[in-house]
């Protein structure tokens, strides 16, 4: 067993996210890896729990990934976006506030912005998926 307090974990600023061969700017966002286990062979852990902080007006742009993720909003007000995979146009916008859980399936293009007036925070649990062998 390992017990950590989130404030004892390094807070790493994120300034870029890759998507479809391009690098997109991330604004006002930092991450703390509370736990991570395994290696999926693509540079990601098989399981992880992360603590994100996004400053007012900060955002995470369109991106996708192999792993499933569920975000649990702790503080703040977020506009969450789901994009059409072919056109990269926003196909759905939703507001998430404390107590909301946001599930993102594997490879779904998505992003979010802190639309509140104070820093927002959420837990993000990731779990990789694997292709079934035939």
Regions found by a protein language model. Give the residues of each.
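A short, N-terminal "cap"/entry segment at the start of jelly-roll beta-barrel domains
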Residues: 1-46, 94
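Double-stranded beta-helix
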Residues: 2-9, 16, 85-88, 109-134
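Conserved hydrophobic/aromatic beta-strand scaffold that supports enzyme active sites
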Residues: 31-33, 49-53, 70, 93, ...
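Short beta-strand His + acidic residue motifs that chelate non-heme Fe in jelly-roll/DSBH
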Residues: 60-62, 80-82, 104, 110-117
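Conserved short histidine dyad/triad with adjacent acidic residue
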Residues: 35-37, 48-65, 106
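Short regulatory "switch" loops immediately downstream of catalytic or recognition motifs
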Residues: 33-37, 76-86, 92
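Short acidic-glycine-tyrosine-enriched beta hairpin
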Residues: 85-106
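Short, conserved beta-strand element in jelly-roll/cupin
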Residues: 51-55, 65-80, 84, 125-127
């Amino acid at each position: 067993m390992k017990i950590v307090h989130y404030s004892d974990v390094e807070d790493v600023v994120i300034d870029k996210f890759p998507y479809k061969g391009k690098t997109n700017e991330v604004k006002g966002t930092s991450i703390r890896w509370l736990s991570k286990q395994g290696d999926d062979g693509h540079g990601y852990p098989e399981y992880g729990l992360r603590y994100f902080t996004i400053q007012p007006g900060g955002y995470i742009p369109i991106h996708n990934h192999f792993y499933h993720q569920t975000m649990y909003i702790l503080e703040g007000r977020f506009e969450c976006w789901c994009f059409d995979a072919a056109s990269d146009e926003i196909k759905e916008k939703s507001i998430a506030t404390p107590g909301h859980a946001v599930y993102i399936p594997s490879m779904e293009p998505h992003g979010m912005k802190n639309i509140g007036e104070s820093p927002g925070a959420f837990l993000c649990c990731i779990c990789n998926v694997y292709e079934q062998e035939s």
